[in-house]
Every structure is written in C-alpha cells, then in structure tokens.
Amino acid sequence: MGLLTGKTALVTGAARGIGKAVAMKFASEGANIAFTDLVLNDDMAAGLEATRKEIEALGVTCRAYAGNAADFEETEKTVKQIHADFGSIDILVNNAGITKDGLMLRMSEAQWDAVLNVNLKSAFNFIHACSPIMLRQRSGSIINMASVVGVHGNAGQCNYAASKAGMIALAKSIAQELGPRVFVPML
C-alpha cells in the first residue's frame, strides 16, 4: 500500500516531461491519476494515450483529458467530468507550462500572452474549478509548480518570469484563503 492509495490526483500538462514524472510517481504511491494536456495533432494524441497506458500499467486507474488549460469554461467542464469519473479530486498539480523566450524589446504580444495564459491563467482556472470540490471534501492539496526565475528573473524570459512570480503570489494568496483544509504549496 502506497502513501497515496485511495487518493485521486489531477496533474495538468502531464503527457510528457515534469508533469508525466509527477503523475508516474503519484501512481507508484497508489494514487489514481487524471491528467490533462493540450492535443493539437495526431502525434500529441498518441503521446497522451501512451502516457495513460504507462501510468495505468502501475496498477491504478488513469484517464487522460485533452484540452486547453488556459480556457476557463473548458477547464470547468473538464474538472466536472474528472470529478464525475473519479468521485473526488484530492490533489491538484498545476504543472502546465510553456516558454517562448526572447528579449523584451523583441517579444511580441502573442509571446507574452501565450506564456501568461498557459503558465498562470491555467493555474487560476484549475484552482477555481477544484477548490469547491476540495472544500466540500474538507481536504485537498493544490501543488503549484513555480520556478526560481519567478523570484530572480532571467534575461530573455520576462514573460516566463512574470508567470512564475504570479504563480508564487497566487499560491500564497490561495493558501490563506483555503487553509487549513486545503494545503497549497509551491515547488
């Protein structure tokens, strides 16, 4: 029996990379996994399905949900479906993130908006959708993936740095609003 047996974890941006590693680790500790990722083509859809099968092979229930985490209404619908499918959401990991690096003087508005929408707005969207569920359950954890760049900045990454600084402030504020029932750390 693992540390997370009987729990349901929702991990955003988990078809690959850090999100996949988090989902795999939680599954190895017994958590059932719901994960999301953006699917724009057949290769991405195949990656989503391959990750689902890999996680499920660890002996837990796993479902993959394709969608745009930066879309508020789509996120609300996805979380409602996940809650219906699993019966609870005990852990939310806000991992979805991108970079579109460039010096600020050359950065387009589209580069700025894309990074802030995926990295910060998606976290707000999922927190907004999952918080009522966790409060009704009287427990939960919302883990936010931050970065040292959000504290110190980084040349060529003003959009990414701003998104991660926002993530840090969001986590601190949400921890004050939802605590002590819901634990809200940032990594």
Report the location of each language-model feature.
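Short-chain dehydrogenase/reductase
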Residues: G2-F86, K100, A110-Q111
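Helix N-cap/beta-alpha junction loops of NAD(P)-dependent oxidoreductase domains
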Residues: T99-L103, V151-N154
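Substrate-binding pocket helix/loop in short-chain dehydrogenase/reductase
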Residues: L103-M104, Q111-L116
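Active-site loop-to-helix junction immediately N-terminal to the catalytic Tyr of the SDR YXXXK motif
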Residues: M107, G153-A161, S173
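Active-site helix of classical SDR
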Residues: I127, S163, A171
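Alpha-helical segment proximal to the catalytic Tyr-Lys
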Residues: P132, Q176-P180
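Residue(s) in the substrate-gating loop at a strand-loop-helix junction
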Residues: S147
